[in-house]
Amino acid sequence: AILGVAIFAAPSLADFHSHPPIHKPPVYTPPVHKPPIHKPPVYTPPVHKPPVYTPPVHKPPSEYKPPVEATNSVTEDHYPIHKPPVYKPPVQKPAPEHKPPVHKPPIHKPPVHNTPSVTDDHYPAHPIHKPQPIHRPPVHKPPTEHKPPVHEPATEHKPSPVYQPPKTEKPVPEHKPPHLPPIVVRPPPTHKPNPPYGHHPRHPPVENTGN
C-alpha cells in the first residue's frame, strides 16, 4: 500500500547542469544616514594627590685627588697613553718593465747655404753726387743811422745806508745738569790723642796704690 507520503526524487547532477539556477542581481539598499549624537564632555575634576616624599640618597664622598701641581706627578688624565707605532711592511712595487731603446733615425736636413752678407767692408759705398751750391750775391744793407748818446741828468745824492751787521743765529744754550747744592770743602778734622788713663780733665788723677 502506498502511504500518503510523497517521495520526491532529488535532482541529479545532470539536471543541475542542464537547468542552472537563475542569477538575480543584488538589490541596492541605500545606506541609512544617522545624525551624530552630540554629547557634552563630562567634566572630571583633577584628583589631588599629595607629593610623595622621597628621602635624599646619601652618597659617600668621592675620593679626594690632589691637583697635579701639588703632587707634581704625571697622570693619564693629563698625558695620553703612549702607544708604540704599528709596523706596516713596505709595499713591494714590481720592477718596471725593461723596454729596449727605440732607434730613431737622424732627421736629414739639407745644408744651409749661408750667403755672404753685403757690408761696407766688402763693397765700398758709392760716392754720393752732391749738386753745386747756388751762388747768391750778398745782400747790401744800408748803414745804420748814427744816434748820439743821450745824456741823462744827474741823479739826486742819496746818503749811504746805515750799516747793519748781519743777523746771527742765537747761540744754543749750553746743556747744564740739574741744580745741585754747592759742594762744601771742609778741612780735615784735627786728631787729638786721647789723654792717658786717669788723667781725664773732668776727673782727678787716680793714684795707683798697688792693691
Curated annotation (Swiss-Prot):
GO terms for cellular component: extracellular region. Transmembrane segments: none annotated. Residues 25-211 are annotated as: Disordered. It comes from the Eukaryota. It is found in: Secreted, Cell wall. Residues 101-111, 127-139 have a biased composition (Basic residues). Residues 1-14 form the signal peptide. This is Proline-rich 33 kDa extensin-related protein.
